[in-house]
């Protein structure tokens, strides 16, 4: 199925989603990669607030290229999500609702997604220019010294995504190949 969602996201918004469903996401999405995640953990360890509201938030693992004239952002393809696995359960426990990236996640992240009623969505890898078409605005909100890894506030419209991990334990990296093999077997 395809769903149309608006941030901030609630558990009720995410509960119907199943691995393999598609989503058109609109609203505010924050960008953060490895270095930004490390700094967020430092803030939390010091008892300080995060630089953006985490409750119901969506984080996109991306380091966009500089924007071209007349564009809000340059190419904005996803980075490998596994690099954020060490930080993710803590953010999910604080209310992070959605992560956007590519690639498999650790068992700890999968369990935390289920425990927190969250989702992990895939952006189209290798199609950064296509993904950028959905970005209406982009502003660096903290840590500009990180360059492309600075935390940005994106406003997106109909951002095309696929559910990889759902709130019920569904995992497209497991169910997808199994469905393919079953379909292939039925043809022979």
Task: Tell where the protein language model's regions lie, with residue ranges.
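C-terminal binding/interaction regions
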Residues: 25, 133-188
């Amino acid at each position: 199925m395809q769903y149309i969602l608006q941030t901030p996201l609630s558990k009720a918004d995410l509960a119907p989603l199943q691995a393999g469903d598609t989503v058109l996401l609109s609203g505010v999405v924050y960008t953060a990669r490895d270095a930004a995640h490390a700094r967020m953990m430092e803030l939390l360890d010091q008892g300080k607030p995060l630089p953006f509201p985490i409750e119901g938030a969506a984080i996109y693992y991306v380091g966009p290229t500089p924007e071209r004239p007349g564009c809000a952002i340059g190419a904005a393809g996803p980075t490998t999500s596994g690099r954020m696995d060490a930080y993710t359960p803590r953010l999910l426990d604080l209310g992070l609702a959605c992560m956007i990236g590519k690639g498999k996640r650790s068992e700890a992240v999968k369990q935390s997604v289920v425990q927190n009623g969250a989702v992990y969505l895939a952006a189209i890898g290798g199609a950064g220019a296509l993904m950028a078409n959905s970005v209406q605005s982009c502003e660096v909100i903290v840590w500009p010294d990180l360059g492309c890894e600075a935390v940005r506030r994106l406003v997106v419209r109909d951002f095309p995504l696929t559910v990889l991990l759902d709130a019920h334990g569904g995992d497209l990296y497991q169910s997808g190949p199994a469905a393919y093999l079953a379909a292939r077997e039925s043809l022979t």
